[in-house]
């Protein structure tokens, strides 16, 4: 078992520790590490991941750990080590990797303690850890928290409850261990920052000596140790490193391999030593005016008046008298010491900076103290009288302000003038630090530099002197001016607002500052460690390090020159080593066979392989944020050989590919061992490329697979309109059946009953067909298009009236033909001949015989009209039909008549005094399946209130009437609609009979008829709703099939495959290949079409134009119909018929394959236990959950499994299907219309909404205790505070830094600010918050995590129901139900504006401008660079009017959305009218 395995085993037993230390040094350490390209993106801060800033760009930058960091991480997993790397090389990132690994492998009761020597460093490292490790609670404890007052174990237990990582100073842990508030067995890892301090009696060394070593000697558990330092040697004596190793039970380790990359990334500064002559200040004669006044005030102090002396004299005890004697001899009182310290500081400032500086300092101190209350808490005397006495002494200094606002050269020191020359002489854009020894010097020097004109023109100066351990510490008089905010200055330096920082040694160690190109040591470094730390701050290319040395210093220029010469010697040695490596590379013969394509002449050689492999990695990761695309190389030393008498390591290389690839394709090895590291990498790259080619990820041109490789040339690129077969017409076949073989035909009859809207029977007819009737039972028709209520035609069951063996069926058949012709002639004979139309669908009047003479066969008379009890038909000249209403004796006045019969020119006008008949005209078109939803206003004379109360009048002498009820004629007029209603059924039946779809055995012919009916047909139902369902079913089936059939394909390739399978072009081809095109119903009902229904088009006119989308939609609708009837299994059978060239698998089979390949026996890290509780689902294979929350940047060597992309690919389709199925299932109060289903689905599956939920959905809040300071002299109290739970996104495992951390911090800040408003809108609002979600600017990574978890649950459970429960819990379905219940407006504001604008053109104009006095904007585009203070403005024109202009937007999309909402608001306030809508300007725009 390896050391890692041993450690993991111990964690399983709850120990979580180790027993190895320095003695493991001689064990085999044959582990590799990975390296990225030397062109990788770099960080701009100390202890980040790398050194150099990446040029700004539009996309997110990606940063991963460099090879040497990963080498150190792996070494720390093997044994205790002290990581020794230069300042800024990324030691903290090594610690983050190590902490994360420790948390995952140890139980929750174990903690990691990160120790740092200073408060500022604790705060900085805590922020780094907190931002990168969110799965565990972490806290920071410093002296500022008054930890020394936590005097019982209950307080400590309460504070540390539920905490996994503690960041604190060394002293805090030492004291906690000393008092048994914390025990060693609760610590799994100790990280010791600035570990070089752990010598002598430093608390870090005492922790090891008193608590660690005894336990180790006894064989008890001890924590792992990880030290971090840039300078393990404090002095020139190398034995101090051995002492440090012994103290920390560790070995000092620095990167030993990858020399080529290390050299390429090390940027040492050019060092310059500058000497100066120090001012000789030996007597008061040389004092400045204010120094003399200070000296005089001090000399005038009478020790006998000192309050402390008077206090001792008043006690008159032996002890007080002895103390009084000592005080009088040494002048050692509080006031005397404060005045002496002020004099010393003044003298020091005079020597360092000159006359102007010291006079300004003394004057400002006096002014500051004089303005304080005599009993200010800043004055730290023992007695109140002492404070007042000191206050009076300071006020007695006759300090005068400086005479000049800007110091003249003669008023400054030679040393300051040297500094000014250095600053003035620097060329380029400076980013620098001036290191000084004393705090007072730092403050005054920064003020001086800030007022000197030519200096402040180039340098924005700040000051940092360090943060005190105790906030309540009393300040000395000489420190009262040092009240600047160190952290604020540091933040400004990091942000670029300050480019020159004057700092004390506090900035030498650890503090995260930008890389500099100018470092000036105003005072000589105290030791070698200090020199190395300061030098490490100058890490930009061509940076400068200036050492200012006093001529008479004990350390001579010669000594520093020797140091500089030694450094140059080191550079030269490094260059010689590079030359040697190049020579070795040339001698290392490259005899690796190239990669040849099997079908083309393409070839990749070993020299080409690295470039090709890098290109492949960029292609497969191009859609992934925060991911370094470079392949990473693990270099291992196999043995050692001697070349030219020099020992040379024999190397092997393993190349690691992105985590988005499956584990079996994540690494490849060099084919043999190599002397040259570069050649070994080339070999490994070629072997990896060969592996990818064999796996099918490289095409035959030896390039990464692209979209064009998936294109079916016969499918893709089809035009929008296609020429397809004419819609199949069933009626010619039916007529043929009537005309042939009647003796062998079975004649089918169904009785039709017409009832009005009240259910009253209006008439009956028997319909006959030589084929079975379609399964239609009820047909609802509107008499005219604007009828409010429909009439109902009900169909009795199909019965047989004749058939084989009948004696004389021809009589009834002929009778039906005759009666049908008469019936149709009654309805339409006055307009056209109906002889042909009567041959298809035939009718018989039950129990009656229709005769031609019944049509207008009787002349009209008043008596005849009154004899009929119901409506009947009146005809003029025996042809045009009307419904009889009444009789009038004379022609009514024309103003009372809506219409009347007019004689033709050759006809005689009937007399006005003759009788006239009042009738109602029959409509030209009737029998509509849908009524008009928009009421049409009738002409004035047809309105009910119109005085024209007579509809139409005809002279009585021209009228005849039918001897059949008017309802029979109306039934005849409905025959075309009845025929049209039957036609789709026949088409659907023929579809199933003639195509392979018949094998699916559809039971519901109504469903099939619906899904082949286009909306253009204008029928009551069409395919759109079912197509919406079928689309989701197809995409789910395609996603699952692609993932199962291509287990080694990354998500990008899977998306290309799926898109090819479900593309409209592919579905069009499937439809035409199946012969589906001629069965798609697109013809809209019309009387003209009914008249021509028996006319078959002749070639070449037997085709029609159809959009490719219609063909694709019907294909998906049939898939949806199959799902409705038989679930996913029948749907997949349907899909396999449509697209037969793919191996379609059932969901169960696919899930079984995917589950099988998921890694077994992977324990769930303890940090992820709360995640399972949040999800409400316990995984059978924990590896699936781990994969679902692993970002592609998680490039830790040895990490099992892949990243989340493939699961996210599956989860996206599962989520889409679950949402669509829920929408389709809604029936109350009515099914949701197709368009609204699209809107609702978009609302709940878009990335912004899902990302918001990934930040909202969180574990339960936890409670922990904090110590609350109640005030001086009062005991502190323990208060319980609630720590918010961790959101789903917070569990994401990643190894990104830099931009990732910044972007996520900004996202969290925006979420904290905007979440209440978004929650309110989602829970109570009547409009979907498109604008708020857009302004939140959540990255795609957030939604990817949620979808990946859904995919993982499906693969693990195989249950869509489990996924639906998860989707319900996260809040997606909950909001969907709420939006449906409350009628939330889902339409996007831009789309809504497009609708309400009607025929007016809407134009958006977006501009960008700098914004004044506001927080920084981080997301910008276009010509304004990232980080500039900009806002987006948008003006909207509707028609020819500028309606609104808004500003303050954070992106172009936000601006347009915001503007659209404003325009809608203005329009609504204007009464929903565009008339007189003025320009509305937002305030400040």
From Swiss-Prot:
Dicer dsRNA-binding fold domain ranges (all copies): 609-712
Top-level taxon of the source organism: Eukaryota
UniProt GO MF annotations: ATP binding; helicase activity; metal ion binding; ribonuclease III activity; RNA binding
Residue ranges annotated for the RNase III domain, each copy included: 988-1127, 1168-1358
Organism: Pyricularia oryzae (strain 70-15 / ATCC MYA-4617 / FGSC 8958) (Rice blast fungus)
Listed GO biological process terms: defense response to virus; regulation of defense response to virus; siRNA processing
Residues annotated as binding Mg(2+): 1208, 1344, 1347
Needed co-factor(s): Mg(2+); Mn(2+)
UniProt motif (DEAH box) ranges: 193-196
Name recorded for this polypeptide: Dicer-like protein 2
Gene: DCL2
Domain Helicase C-terminal positions: 415-579
């Amino acid at each position: 078992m390896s050391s890692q395995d041993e450690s993991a085993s111990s964690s399983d037993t709850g120990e979580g520790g180790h027993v190895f230390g320095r003695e493991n040094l001689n064990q085999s350490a044959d582990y590799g590490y990975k390296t990225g390209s030397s062109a990788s993106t770099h960080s701009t801060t100390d202890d980040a991941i790398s050194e150099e800033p990446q040029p700004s760009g539009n996309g997110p930058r990606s940063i991963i750990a460099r090879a040497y960091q990963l080498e150190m991480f792996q070494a720390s997993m093997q044994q205790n080590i002290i990581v020794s790397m230069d300042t800024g090389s990324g030691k903290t990132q090594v610690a983050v990797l190590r902490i994360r690994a420790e948390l995952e492998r140890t139980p929750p009761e174990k903690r990691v303690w990160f120790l740092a020597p200073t408060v500022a460093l604790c705060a900085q490292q805590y922020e780094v850890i907190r931002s990168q490790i969110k799965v565990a609670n972490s806290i920071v404890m410093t002296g500022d928290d008054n930890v020394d007052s936590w005097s019982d174990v209950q307080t400590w237990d309460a504070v540390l409850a539920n905490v996994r990582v503690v960041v604190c100073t060394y002293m805090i842990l030492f004291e906690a261990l000393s008092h048994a508030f914390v025990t060693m067995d609760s610590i799994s890892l100790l990280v010791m920052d600035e570990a070089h301090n752990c010598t002598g009696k430093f608390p870090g060394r005492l922790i090891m000596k008193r608590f660690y070593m005894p336990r180790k000697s006894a064989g008890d558990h001890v924590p792992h140790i990880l030290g971090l330092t840039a300078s393990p040697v404090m002095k020139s004596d190398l034995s101090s490193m051995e002492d440090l190793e012994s103290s920390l039970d560790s070995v000092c380790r620095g990167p030993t391999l990858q020399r080529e990359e290390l050299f390429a990334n090390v940027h040492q500064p050019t060092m310059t030593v500058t000497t100066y002559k120090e001012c000789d200040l030996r007597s008061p004669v040389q004092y400045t005016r204010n120094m003399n006044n200070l000296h005089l005030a001090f000399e005038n102090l009478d020790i006998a008046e000192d309050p402390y002396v008077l206090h001792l004299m008043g006690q008159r005890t032996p002890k007080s008298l002895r103390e009084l004697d000592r005080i009088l001899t040494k002048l050692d009182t509080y006031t005397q010491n404060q005045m002496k310290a002020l004099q010393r500081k003044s003298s020091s400032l005079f020597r360092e900076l000159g006359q102007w500086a010291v006079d300004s300092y003394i004057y400002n101190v006096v002014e500051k103290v004089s303005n304080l209350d005599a009993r200010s808490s800043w004055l730290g005397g023992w007695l109140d009288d002492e404070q007042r006495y000191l206050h009076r002494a300071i006020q007695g200094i006759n300090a005068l302000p400086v005479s000049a606002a800007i110091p003249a050269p003669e008023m400054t020191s030679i040393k300051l003038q040297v500094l000014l020359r250095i600053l003035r002489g620097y060329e380029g854009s400076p980013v620098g630090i001036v290191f000084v020894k004393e705090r007072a010097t730092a403050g005054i020097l920064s003020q001086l530099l800030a007022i000197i004109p030519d200096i402040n023109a180039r340098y924005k100066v700040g000051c940092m002197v360090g943060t005190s351990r105790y906030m309540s510490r009393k300040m000395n008089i000489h420190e009262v001016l040092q009240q600047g905010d160190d952290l604020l200055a540091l933040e400004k330096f990091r942000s670029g607002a300050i480019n020159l920082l004057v700092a004390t040694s506090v900035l030498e160690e650890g503090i995260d500052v930008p890389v500099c190109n100018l470092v000036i040591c105003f005072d000589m470094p105290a030791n070698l460690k200090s020199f190395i730390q300061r030098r490490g701050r100058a890490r930009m290319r061509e940076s400068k390090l200036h050492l200012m040395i006093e001529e008479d210093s004990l350390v001579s220029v010669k000594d520093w020159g020797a140091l500089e010469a030694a450094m140059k010697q080191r550079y030269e040695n490094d260059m010689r080593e590079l030359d040697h490596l190049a020579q070795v590379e040339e001698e290392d013969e490259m005899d690796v066979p190239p990669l040849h394509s099997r079908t083309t002449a393409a070839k990749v050689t070993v020299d080409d392989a690295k470039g090709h492999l890098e290109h492949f990695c960029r292609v497969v990761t191009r859609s992934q944020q925060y991911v370094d695309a470079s392949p990473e190389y693990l270099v291992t030393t196999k043995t050692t050989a001697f070349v030219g008498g020099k020992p040379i390591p024999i190397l092997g290389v393993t190349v690691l590919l992105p985590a988005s690839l499956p584990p079996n394709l994540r690494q490849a090895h060099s084919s043999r061992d190599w002397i040259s590291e570069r050649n070994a990498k080339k070999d490994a790259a070629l072997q990896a490329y060969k592996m990818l080619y064999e796996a099918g990820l490289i095409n035959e041109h030896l390039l990464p697979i692209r979209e064009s490789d998936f294109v079916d040339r016969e499918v893709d690129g089809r035009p929008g309109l296609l020429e397809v077969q004419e819609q199949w017409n069933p009626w010619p076949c039916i007529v043929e059946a009537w005309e042939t073989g009647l003796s062998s035909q079975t004649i089918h009859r169904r009785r039709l009953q017409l009832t009005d809207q009240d259910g009253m029977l209006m008439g009956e007819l028997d319909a006959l067909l030589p084929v079975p009737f379609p399964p239609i039972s009820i047909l609802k028709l509107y008499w005219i298009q604007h009828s409010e209520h429909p009439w109902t035609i009900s169909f009795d069951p199909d019965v047989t009236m004749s058939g084989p063996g009948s004696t004389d069926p021809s009589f009834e058949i002929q009778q039906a033909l005759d009666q049908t012709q008469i019936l149709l002639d009654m309805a339409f004979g006055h307009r056209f001949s109906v002889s042909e139309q009567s041959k298809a669908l035939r009718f018989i009047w039950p129990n009656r015989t229709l005769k031609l003479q019944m049509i207008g066969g009787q002349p009209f008379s008043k008596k005849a009209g009154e004899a009929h009890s119901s409506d009947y038909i009146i005809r003029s000249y025996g042809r045009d039909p009307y419904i009889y209403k009444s009789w009038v004796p004379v022609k009514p006045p024309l103003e009372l008549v809506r219409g009347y019969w007019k004689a033709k020119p050759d006809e005689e006008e009937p007399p006005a005094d003759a009788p006239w008949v009042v009738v109602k005209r029959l409509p030209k078109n009737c029998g509509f399946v849908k009524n008009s939803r928009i009421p049409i206003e009738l002409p004035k004379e047809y309105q009910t209130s119109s005085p024209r109360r007579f509809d139409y009048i005809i002279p009585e002498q021209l009228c005849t009437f039918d001897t059949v009820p008017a309802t029979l004629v109306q039934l005849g007029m409905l025959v075309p609609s009845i025929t049209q209603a039957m036609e789709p059924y026949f088409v659907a039946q023929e579809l199933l009979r003639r195509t392979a779809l018949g094998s699916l055995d559809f039971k519901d012919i109504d469903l099939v008829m619906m899904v082949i009916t286009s909306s253009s047909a204008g029928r009551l139902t069409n395919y759109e709703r079912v197509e919406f369902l079928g689309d989701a079913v197809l995409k789910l089936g395609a996603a699952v099939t692609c993932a199962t059939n291509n287990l080694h394909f990354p998500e990008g390739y899977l998306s290309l495959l799926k898109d090819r399978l479900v593309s409209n072009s592919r579905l069009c081809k499937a439809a035409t290949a199946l012969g589906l095109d001629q069965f798609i119903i697109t013809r809209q009902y019309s009387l003209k079409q009914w008249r021509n229904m028996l006319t078959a088009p002749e070639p070449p006119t037997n085709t029609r134009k159809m959009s490719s989308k219609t063909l694709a939609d019907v294909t998906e609708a049939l898939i949806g119909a199959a799902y409705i009837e038989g679930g996913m299994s029948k749907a997949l059978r349907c899909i396999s018929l449509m697209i037969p060239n793919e191996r379609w698998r059932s969901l169960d089979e696919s899930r079984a394959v995917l589950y099988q390949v998921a890694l077994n026996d992977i324990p769930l890290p303890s940090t992820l236990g709360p995640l399972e509780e949040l999800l409400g689902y316990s995984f059978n294979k924990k590896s699936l959950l781990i994969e679902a929350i692993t970002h592609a940047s998680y490039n830790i060597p040895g990490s099992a499994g892949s990243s989340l992309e493939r699961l996210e690919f599956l989860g996206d389709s599962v989520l889409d299907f679950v949402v669509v199925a829920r929408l389709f299932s809604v029936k109350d109060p009515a099914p949701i219309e197709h368009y609204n289903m699209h809107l609702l689905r978009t609302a709940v599956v878009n990335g912004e909404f899902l990302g918001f939920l990934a930040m909202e959905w969180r574990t339960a809040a936890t409670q922990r205790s904090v110590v609350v300071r109640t005030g001086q002299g009062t005991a502190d109290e323990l208060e319980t505070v609630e720590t918010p739970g961790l959101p789903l996104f917070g569990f994401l495992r990643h190894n990104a830094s830099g931009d990732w951390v910044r972007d996520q911090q900004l996202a969290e800040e925006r979420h904290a600010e905007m979440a209440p408003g978004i929650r309110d809108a989602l829970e109570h609002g009547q409009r979907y918050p498109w604008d708020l979600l857009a302004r939140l600017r959540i990255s795609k990574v957030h939604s990817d995590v949620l979808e990946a978890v859904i995919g993982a649950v499906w693969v693990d459970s195989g249950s869509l129901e489990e996924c639906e429960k998860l989707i319900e819990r996260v809040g997606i379905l909950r909001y969907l139900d709420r939006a449906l219940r409350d009628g939330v407006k889902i339409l996007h504001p831009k789309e809504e504006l497009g609708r309400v604008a009607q025929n007016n053109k809407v134009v958006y104009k977006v501009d960008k401008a700098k914004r004044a006095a506001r927080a920084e904007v981080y997301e910008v585009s276009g010509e304004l660079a990232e980080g500039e203070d900009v806002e987006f403005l948008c003006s909207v024109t509707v028609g020819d009017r500028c309606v609104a202009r808004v500003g303050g937007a954070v992106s172009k999309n936000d601006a347009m959305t915001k503007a659209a909402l404003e325009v809608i608001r203005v329009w609504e306030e204007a009464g929903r009218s565009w008339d007189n809508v003025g320009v509305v300007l937002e305030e400040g725009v």
